[in-house]
């Protein structure tokens, strides 16, 4: 049987090879003898048709109504939706990281919150967020948008929002930005884990991603007042160190202040660590986030332009890795042992730090930015623990503090070309990120305070002790007999 199969395979290969063999022989026979030298083509000569041109001409001559155009716009649009899918995967990373760094009795609750966030995030962004985020001409501070309409209307290369030319359709831009919108609430989810009331969090998350995030984002990405910063050069926040990460981080800080620490975390004898139940899950979550970040930053190029895209991928990877190395070194010195959770947060700190400036810094600059972010995150986590701000996953430090660092780093490490002038300065960058942080903090504090005095924001001590899987959902994540 094996012999028969091989014989058939050889016969089939021979049949396939015959046309190529005769084609090559014919081409060789038809080719003229080598000439001493051919005359140079005139400067204005038409370029020879390539295989793609031949294919398009063949399709056109066949009477077909549609022929794919392999052009820059098409490739850019394809890259945008791929990047959106990569950012979507980040939400699985956030959920897995949060589950791993918390107690097993709260796993179902955390997964439910993250599932709700992505669902309400995309829907609310479609109903109000997108056209609030990109309102076009407005007064620079506040403009509430309507639900999305036909985003293909007048679509094409060069069509966009707020005067921004995009190499994508309106729908492509919407789905990419919608993935960003849900991220802010996901950051808060990790910080308030294990003791927040589910209904209160759901109301808060809806208002945050549907209203607050797009309003603040419009100040920068929607043609708002931040365009006047840095001497008219605008606020530099390439992919969202401020308007996504610092926004989420300082929103989380406000919520944690009102919510309080988990029971037993801080005692008269000092700080009692509440260990996460699965470091493998936490590690998987971080590497999913690392992967998705290539879409987060790479998609923010808003096209498939090879130069910027390659630079952004490189600076993103370098900053993440030096962030991890910085966290490893510092945590080993300070804690006397290599700490995996600090290392994982070091990766994320480097990624947050480079998100503002990935397109304007050098490879060396990216490594320094990531290294400093990794050092910052260790001291920041320890600082918040010391002042009894209980953040189970380190979200405030990773996203809030390192988000601020990324914005300032854009001014410090900006590469200025020969003959060009510096565009971004510490004063303008600091003003922009403080405005974002203050807006996020005040909005979140007010909303969470209203929820606290009305429906309540914290579960009872009994429910917290039992675990929110059973208390809120009536079902544990793990059935261990």
What are these regions (language model features)?
Residues 5-9, 23, 27-481:
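Hydrophobic alpha-helical transmembrane bundles of multi-pass membrane proteins
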């Amino acid at each position: 049987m094996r012999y028969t199969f091989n014989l058939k395979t050889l016969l089939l290969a021979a049949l396939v090879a015959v046309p190529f063999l005769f084609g090559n022989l014919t081409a060789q026979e038809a080719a003229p003898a080598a000439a001493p030298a051919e005359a140079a083509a005139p400067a204005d000569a038409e370029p020879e048709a390539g295989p793609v041109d031949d294919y398009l001409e063949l399709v056109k001559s066949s009477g077909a109504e549609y022929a794919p155009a392999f052009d820059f716009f098409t490739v850019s649009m394809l890259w945008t939706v791929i990047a959106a899918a990569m950012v979507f995967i980040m939400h699985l990373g956030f959920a897995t990281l949060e589950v791993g760094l918390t107690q097993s009795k709260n796993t179902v609750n955390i997964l439910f919150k993250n599932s709700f966030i992505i669902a309400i995030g995309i829907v609310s962004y479609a109903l109000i967020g997108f056209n609030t985020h990109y309102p076009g001409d407005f007064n620079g501070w506040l403009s509430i948008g309507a639900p999305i309409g036909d985003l293909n209307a007048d679509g094409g290369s060069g069509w966009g929002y707020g005067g921004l030319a995009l190499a994508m359709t309106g729908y492509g831009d919407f789905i990419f930005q919608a993935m960003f919108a849900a991220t802010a609430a996901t950051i808060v989810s990790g910080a308030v884990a294990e003791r927040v009331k589910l209904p209160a969090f759901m109301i808060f998350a809806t208002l945050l991603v549907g209203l607050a995030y797009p309003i603040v984002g419009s100040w920068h990405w929607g043609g708002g007042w931040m365009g006047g910063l840095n001497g008219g050069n605008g606020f530099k926040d390439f992919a969202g160190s401020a308007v996504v990460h610092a926004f989420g981080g300082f929103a989380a800080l406000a919520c944690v202040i009102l919510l309080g620490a988990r029971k037993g975390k801080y005692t008269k004898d000092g700080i009692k660590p509440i260990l996460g139940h699965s470091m493998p899950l936490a590690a998987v979550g971080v590497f999913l986030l690392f992967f998705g970040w290539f879409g987060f930053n790479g998609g923010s190029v808003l096209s498939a332009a090879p130069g910027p895209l390659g630079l952004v991928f490189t600076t993103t990877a370098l900053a993440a890795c030096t962030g991890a190395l910085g966290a490893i070194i510092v945590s080993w010195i300070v804690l006397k042992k290599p700490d995996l959770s600090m290392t994982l947060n070091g990766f994320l700190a480097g990624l947050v730090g480079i998100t503002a400036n990935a397109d304007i810094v050098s490879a060396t600059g990216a490594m320094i930015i990531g290294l400093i972010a990794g050092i910052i995150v260790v001291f920041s986590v320890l600082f918040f623990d010391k002042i009894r701000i209980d953040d189970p996953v380190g979200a405030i430090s990773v996203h809030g503090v390192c988000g601020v660092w990324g914005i300032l780093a854009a001014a410090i490490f900006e590469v200025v070309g020969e003959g060009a002038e510096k565009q971004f300065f510490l004063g303008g960058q600091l003003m922009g990120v403080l405005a974002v942080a203050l807006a996020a903090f005040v909005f979140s504090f007010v909303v969470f305070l209203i929820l606290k005095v009305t429906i309540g924001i914290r579960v009872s001590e009994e429910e917290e002790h039992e675990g929110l899987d059973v208390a809120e959902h009536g079902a544990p994540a793990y059935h261990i007999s």
